[in-house]
Amino acid sequence: MSNLFDSDSPTNLAEYSVSELSGSIKRTIETAFDQVRVRGEISGYRGPHSSGHAYFALKDDRARIDAVIWKGTFSRLKFRPEEGMEVIATGKVTTFPGSSKYQIVIETLEPAGAGALMALIEERKRRLGAEGLFDAARKKRLPFMPHVIGVVTSPTGAVIRDILHRISDRFPVHVLVWPVKVQGEGSGEEVANAIRGFNALEPASAISRPDVLIVARGGGSLEDLWSFNDEIVVRAAAESRIPLISAVGHETDWTLIDYAADVRAPTPTGAAEMAVPVKAELEAQAAALAARLQGCMNRQMDQRRQSVRSLMRAFPSLDQLLALPRRRFDEAAAGLGRGLELNTINKRRGFERVIAHLRPDLLSGRISERRQMLNERMVRAERMVERLIDRSASRVERAEAILASLPARLKAQTDRSRERLGNLTRHADTAIRHQLTRARAELSAQDRVLQSLSYKNVLRRGYAVIRDEDNRPVSQAAALSAGMGIAIEFADGRIGAMTTEGGTPPGGAKKRSTKPAEPTKQGSLF
């Protein structure tokens, strides 16, 4: 009976292994929550992982659930998730049996109403505005007549066609288009990189640097225009050194890039109108200004002619002014003939005097003098050359003599150096031997001092050193107790001993008798 009550009672509960239970829970949850919509705030979002997947959590004021967006789904999202954004996520709940954790795999993601996005925009606008990115002092004036216009927009669509058509109608200039995505994943980075890329161009590079930038996109919902609210786009627009016109959406659509841009255009077409003036209007203004200038010039010319006429009436006539000069000219012309005749006579007389000095005998004498002078100079030159040759020969002979005596001089110098080296070597050997002798003597003296101070000498005089069990010297009896093992060191070695109480040798050893043993009365068998 006792065995019956002690045995385990049977049960109807099924027995699971841990993996079976985890798998059953996984199937139950995934079946019950195959498609769910969850409203919550994004928490812990740090952007997509290097694999392309995005991991974060959805939370409210009382709970949180892990969430994941796979790479393929992430690329199809209409807007980018951001930290603190309230969203509605659609997907399925799944678990990990290995760790008993569950999460929602998001298939679609949308903001929880426009109010959530507007609240996020207002918070970002307040924060960036506090940094001064929207200050009016940062705004730059647009150039009146740009030579090159840079456009950041989608290469396909009506926006770029409208901008090019409007610029062509008003004032044809060179347009550079930087194609980008204007919505979806990665569009914000492309727009920011395009703005920075235009600013990085050098003015004298092969691709001309634009004088003004237009960032444009057509109309759309708040989610479609969300890329132009990205912080990276706003900062790139605020940092642009090139004047920037934002033309995103329609006139009623406002994005954060509109506050950071230098000028906001209501539409892309309006941006083109702001960028360039109307050529026909400029031509009309130029024609009107030219007409006004011509009228001013005509009036000035008339006034100057009238002034000249007035001045001419005040001056005497030309005949009166030239009467005296004409008379002087006639008198000078009359005296010119006589002057020429006198000048000719004087020149002829001078020529005759020169000819008188150029007789053949005088020329022969001068030639003889010059020849004699030349001969004397040649003789002096020959003597000078001979002296130079003699001095050079003497120098050569002295150099040869020096070279001939050089081996003997080198040999004598070498012998003297060898003899000096031998003397130095002998002196060095002698000095080293003296140093070694003094060092040995000092070492012997120090060794004798060391031996005299060694405790071994004391032991040779009959003393001993007592050491305890730790081989430490014992200098007082109080340091020992009965029953301790000690070592006694003599001059010729060590022995072991045991301490006793009161200094009595162990075993009550008796003093040996020095008396000879008395012979016994009992006889010996031997």
Curated annotation (Swiss-Prot):
GO molecular function, a single term: nucleic acid binding
Entry's Gene Ontology BP terms: DNA catabolic process
Stretches for region Disordered: 497-526
Domain of life: Bacteria
Protein's cellular compartments: Cytoplasm
Keyword Hydrolase: yes
Alphabetically ordered keywords of this record: Cytoplasm, Exonuclease, Hydrolase, Nuclease
UniProt xrefs under Pfam families: Exonuc_VII_L, tRNA_anti_2
GO cellular component: cytoplasm; exodeoxyribonuclease VII complex
Catalytic activities: Exonucleolytic cleavage in either 5'- to 3'- or 3'- to 5'-direction to yield nucleoside 5'-phosphates
EC id: 3.1.11.6
Function (record text): Bidirectionally degrades single-stranded DNA into large acid-insoluble oligonucleotides, which are then degraded further into small acid-soluble oligonucleotides.
Family indicated by similarity: Belongs to the XseA family.
Subunit structure, as described in the record: Heterooligomer composed of large and small subunits.
Matches recorded under HAMAP family: Exonuc_7_L
Protein name: Exodeoxyribonuclease 7 large subunit
Source species: Rhizobium etli (strain ATCC 51251 / DSM 11541 / JCM 21823 / NBRC 15573 / CFN 42)
Gene that encodes it: xseA
